[in-house]
């Protein structure tokens, strides 16, 4: 009898322990619309929200100290000076992330979307790469490989929605005339070379005087192109390429270096307004690039360790609308799509379990490996 009693006590203790485990990590925190939100996806949304807050931390705030940082105040809008307590900001951003995930999956299904086998393979590959790079950190935050696979699928669905909503056969198609106007008026098509401000053999960096001398030589080459701009993107590219090839030996010689055999090979970029600002972060350079007319060349300080020689071209003279369609559509409509997704997600019925979410508070986030 005594043995049976002990066995019963042990069984009860085991049952209580199992219940405790299930309560500490719920399988799901509920639904938004008809989309189930597993605990792993909730934890990923919360972790991402925390990282967004961490990016807004001031120099004297340490986001690796989670408990204290959650109590801190951050500036969330430099233009208006709006501030927020980190814990409130993380909670709001977590909800917005979940609403976005649910909206993407719902809209994708509504429009008859189906991921291709290649897209699913790509999602799995990206998820595995993330786990290989930061697996310990993800695992410490309760985020497993299956969650990352689902998240990567959501990202691909979001990309597909751009075409499904605004593409040629989309729900609200953008006309070729609208795309053409956007390409010509709002985007900048360039061919360019990046010139390092250091000796590529010794890695000795240019001082201020040497950097200024190299930039002046590059600008002189650009001005020689602008003195007689030929007609057509092909001729403009050829003239620019010749000017670059002629100028590079003297530019590299400032640092006792020589250009490699492919140093004058031109790269191509199509930049939207946000891309231009991000690409040309040195003061005044983004505006200088925007001000160029098709066929005009320039040389600008690209970063603290490189300058860029570039020529702006008419995108539809240098390329075709079909080949530029995806980039132009993304630049034109990505912001609108994101706003509509966020609004759609906020309007979906919410059946989230606050008790379940409280079992996974932001205070348990691990923000260092």
Locate the predicted segments by residue:
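Positively charged n-region of N-terminal signal peptides that target proteins for export
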Residues: 1-12
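C-terminal motif of bacterial Sec signal peptides marking the signal peptidase cleavage site
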Residues: 16-20
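N-terminal targeting/tethering segments
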Residues: 23-143
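PPIase-associated folding chaperone regions across multiple families
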Residues: 23-25, 32, 138-216, 276-369
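Sec-exported extracytoplasmic/periplasmic mature domains
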Residues: 47-54, 95-116, 125-139, 143, ...
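A solvent-exposed, charged loop/short amphipathic helix patch at secondary-structure junctions
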Residues: 61-78, 201-223, 320-322
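Extended amphipathic secondary-structure runs
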Residues: 92-124, 161, 260, 269-273, ...
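Peptidyl-prolyl cis-trans isomerase
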Residues: 220-282
């Amino acid at each position: 009898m005594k043995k049976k009693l002990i066995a019963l006590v042990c069984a009860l203790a085991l049952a209580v322990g199992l219940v405790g485990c299930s309560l500490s990590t719920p399988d799901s925190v509920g639904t938004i619309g008809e989309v189930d939100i597993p605990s792993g996806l909730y934890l990923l949304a919360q972790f991402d929200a925390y990282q967004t807050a961490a990016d807004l931390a001031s120099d004297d705030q340490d986001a690796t100290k989670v408990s204290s940082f959650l109590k801190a105040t951050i500036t969330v809008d430099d233009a208006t000076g709006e501030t927020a307590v980190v814990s409130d900001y993380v909670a709001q951003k977590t909800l917005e992330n979940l609403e976005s995930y649910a909206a993407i999956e719902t809209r994708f299904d509504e429009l008859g979307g189906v991921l291709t086998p290649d897209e699913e393979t790509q999602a799995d590959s990206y998820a595995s790469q993330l786990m290989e790079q930061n697996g310990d950190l993800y695992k410490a935050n309760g985020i497993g490989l299956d969650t990352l696979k689902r998240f990567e699928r959501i990202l691909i669905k979001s990309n597909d929605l751009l075409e499904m909503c605004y593409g040629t056969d989309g729900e609200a198609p953008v006309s070729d005339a609208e795309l053409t106007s956007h390409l010509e008026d709002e985007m900048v098509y360039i061919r360019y070379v990046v010139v390092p401000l250091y000796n590529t053999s010794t890695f000795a960096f240019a001082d201020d005087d040497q950097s200024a001398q190299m930039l002046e030589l590059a600008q002189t080459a650009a001005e020689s192109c602008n003195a007689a701009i030929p007609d057509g993107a092909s001729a403009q590219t050829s003239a620019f390429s010749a000017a670059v090839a002629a100028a590079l030996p003297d530019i590299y010689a400032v640092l006792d270096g020589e250009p490699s055999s492919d140093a004058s090979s031109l790269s191509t970029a199509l930049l939207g307004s946000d891309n231009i600002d991000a690409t040309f972060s040195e003061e005044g350079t983004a505006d200088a690039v925007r001000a160029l007319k098709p066929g005009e060349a320039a040389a600008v300080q690209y970063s603290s360790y490189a300058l860029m020689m570039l020529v702006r071209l008419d995108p539809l003279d240098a390329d075709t609308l079909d080949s530029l369609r995806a980039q132009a559509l993304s630049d034109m409509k990505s912001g609108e799509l994101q706003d509509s997704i966020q609004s759609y997600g906020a309007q979906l019925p919410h059946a989230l379990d606050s008790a379940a979410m409280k079992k996974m508070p932001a205070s348990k986030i691990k923000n260092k490996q």
